[in-house]
Amino acid sequence: MQRNNEMRRVVVTGYGAITPLGSNAQASWQAIMDYQLGYGYVDKTELGIKAHFLGLIAEEPSLKGVPAAIRRRLPRFARLTLGAAREAMSMAFGESSPLDFYSPLMCGAIMGTGWGGLDESYYAAREFALQGVSSPFNCFYTMPNVTSAACSQYWNLRGYQNTVVA
């Protein structure tokens, strides 16, 4: 096996955010600067959740322009992630695509999550417990790496793909 010791650089040239404070990075940052809270009292005791102060994301980003083949099979956490990734890519490349500058084999996607897929796992388990059957697509909804897969498909990135789970 031949080793490639050539240094490669990764440059982050854009960022995106969808948070309880705002539907994009600018709105979230402005809310922080205005000392706004991103959490509030939410009673979920009927679901066995003892925490009462939660930060919930009220609205989802528009995924207009995302092909239906990608969009319709994404769980909520992946739709939120794709929305933030679109903001980051827009900041980095404007109206262009990464493929206008780089080979698709040299472009990849690395995403990170700490919770992604767990809510969907709980929903699927509950659905199965109540009905004895659940959607065959739940295997896709519960995968944390569905976000990096969606980004790779959307931008036609054919390089390295990974999802870091904390």
Model-derived features: positions:
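Conserved "HGTGT" condensation-loop signature of ketosynthase/thiolase-family condensing enzymes
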Residues: 1-160
